[in-house]
Amino acid sequence: MPIDPNRDSWKPGEPWEKALDEMDYIRSLAKEMGGPDRIKRQHDGDRYTIRERIEKFLDPESFFEAGPMVGAAEYDADGNMTEFLPGAYVLGMGKINGRNVAIGGDDFTISGGSPHNVHKGASQFTQRLALQYGIPYVQFIEGVGHSSKSDEAAGHMGLPGGNIWYRQLELLSKVPVAAGIMGSVAGAPAAFGLMSHFTVMIKGKSQIFPSGPPVVRRALGEDLDKEQLGGAAVHVHTSGQIDNEADSEEEAFEQIKSFLSYLPDTTSEVAPRVENDDPVDRRPEELLTIMPQERRHPYDPRKLIKLVVDNGEFFEMRRYYGGSLITGFARLGGYSVGVVGNDPLVLAGAMNGDAADKYTHFVDLCDTFNLPMVIFLDMPGFMLGSAAEKQATMRRGVRALIASHEAKVPKVEFNVRKSYGVAADAPNSLGEPDGLNLRFGWPAGEWGGIPIEGGVAAAYRREIESAPDPEAHRTMIEERLLRLRSPMRAAQKFDVIDLIDPRDTRKIACQFVELAQPLLHRIADRPKRAVRP
């Protein structure tokens, strides 16, 4: 950064007024970031600078910057500053909707946001601030990671390892962590971004990978651009590595704010109640007709969820990954809840490996932040076939069952239609030998160890094959067993607390969530482990 060659820097012993002037001068140099040309390049790429991001994200005039004078300075023999390069990380604290957060982000205009131009004490300050004061941690990631030029400058190649991840992992067990992937991100910055409870990237503007296209091309011969290698189409729609996508940086900011609004400040607290004007005893008439009479016909599960929750507001996470399962946050009676449902429009709602992993992560997230869970179950079972077997679907499903079993937060389940087999046991898991999760049924409910069609084909195979008319005999057996699937019979055996009018779903769910509050407060301070991405 150019320095006025005629400027006489303040020295110890000189007047305080000159010291204050010097402080302001250094701060002004830091705010120039990488200079006008690099700022213009950032804007030409339709991206904000890190200082603009922080200003737009936080409440007006709420940002308190930490380390506003941090940078690499050089001085001559007379003690006058001759060079100054601002640090590539801007950090501090501020407010979102009046709530304190620790915040930091990479300055891509300086060395591409490389961590080698970030003072270690500065980069760790926001982590320590969030941990000590128990406030959410927000990071805007736009850094390229390690550079071979750094090795050459150092004169050696360092051995990876050490404890650089310790505080970030501790954060994941103590406070909410959210990250915006704001540009091309690789190496350690990518890993830090993924060590978050919520991640969002910008369509067409953000990419994330261990190494970028030049390294991939040299190592594997794959000729891909950044978007093909690690854009939103890859990591939001396919791999599930990133939770959500946004059309703009402003939308990404709003998603992060929405995510944080459902969580408490720490994992040892319960999210506060938010007042609203949606009556807890509201009876949505559409719930009575949302389920088709024909059991094989689909319906809109997101519409179902929005009809039940407060004001129809549902914050969905990982919509495109494991798409047969729906996960997200909402409120009932003003209280935050985790919501799980099935999408019959994707794999008929069956659990494949990706959906199982999605559930495992989400139930861990709800358990860590003491959110009761509301489940709208329409689970026909595990996805079948050779492709499902090659993806270790059942092993991943068992992991989901274990995660559900270990979760201590209470659950209420509405069996809106199908509930079959081990796959349905994941949300049904009671958590303890005498655990109690509340289960209700809708009139469309049907459940069992195996769907009738498949069960008949397996259990009655020889009888069917030996019949004069195998197809007619199979149909006869299926019709006989179909009479047994009436949810009335299950209710008579107390498989569910009750069969309910679907229009009463909201009222019952709100009663459950209110009932759960004292329990949540009692268990909130139990030890937590880092939520794994």
Residue ranges and their predicted role:
Residues 1-533:
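Ligand-binding clefts of soluble mixed alpha/beta catalytic domains
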